[in-house]
Design a protein with these regions (language model features):
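Post-signal peptide N-terminal segment of mature Sec-exported envelope proteins
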Residues: 25-46
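Bacterial signal peptide processing site
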Residues: 18-21
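A generic, residue-level signal for flexible/boundary positions that often mark functional hotspots
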Residues: 8-11, 124
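Mature extracytoplasmic domains of secretory-pathway proteins
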Residues: 54, 58-113
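N-terminal export and membrane-targeting signals
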Residues: 1-9
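Flexible, solvent-exposed extracytoplasmic
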Residues: 47-51
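C-terminal motif of bacterial Sec signal peptides marking the signal peptidase cleavage site
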Residues: 13-16
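Extracytosolic low-complexity repeat regions of secreted or lipid-anchored proteins
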Residues: 91-143
Length: 143
C-alpha cells in the first residue's frame, strides 16, 4: 500500500519538473526562409534574377512587376499568393527563378548583399520542348 501511495505522490512531482516553455534556452531554433508558393505563368516574360523583392511593400512590388511584359497578370498573381499565404511571422518576397519549359521543384534562399537571393533548384528531368514558355516566380517567406 505504501508503494502505491508513494507512486501516486511522485507523479505530480515529476509532472512539475517538465520543461518551462518560457525558458529562452528551450525555444525552437530560429526560423529558416521557406518557399511559400511557386507561381507558374504562361508567356509572362520577365528576367531570371536571384534578387527577391518584398512584395508587401508597394514600391518593391512596383519595381518587381516592371520587369514583366504582362504586368497586370503578374501583379494580380503575386497579390493573390500574398493573400493566400495568410498571416506569417516573416516578410514575403518574390523572385523570378526560371523561364522556359520546366518548373523548378524547389528553391534555395540565401542572404545577398542588398536583399535576399532566391535560386531555382536544378531541374532533374528537363523537357526538350514545350508549347509556350512559363515564368516561375517563387514567393518566399523571409524571417
Amino acid at each position: 500500500m505504501r508503494r502505491i501511495i508513494s507512486a501516486l505522490l511522485l507523479v505530480p512531482f515529476l509532472a512539475g519538473c517538465a520543461s518551462d516553455p518560457q525558458d529562452p534556452g528551450l525555444q525552437p531554433a530560429d526560423a529558416e526562409p521557406e518557399l511559400v508558393q511557386m507561381l507558374v505563368l504562361t508567356s509572362a516574360g520577365g528576367t531570371v534574377s536571384p534578387a527577391a523583392y518584398f512584395v508587401e511593400d508597394r514600391k518593391e512590388m512596383n519595381a518587381y512587376v516592371k520587369t514583366f511584359e504582362d504586368r497586370d497578370d503578374v501583379a494580380a498573381a503575386v497579390q493573390q499568393a500574398v493573400k493566400d499565404a495568410g498571416d506569417r511571422e516573416g516578410r514575403l518576397a518574390a523572385a523570378t527563378v526560371a523561364i522556359g519549359c520546366d518548373v523548378p521543384e524547389g528553391v534555395s534562399i540565401t542572404e545577398g548583399e542588398d536583399r535576399p537571393e532566391v535560386r531555382a533548384d536544378k531541374i532533374t528531368n528537363p523537357k526538350q520542348e514545350c508549347f509556350a514558355p512559363t515564368t516561375s516566380i517563387a514567393v518566399v517567406e523571409i524571417p
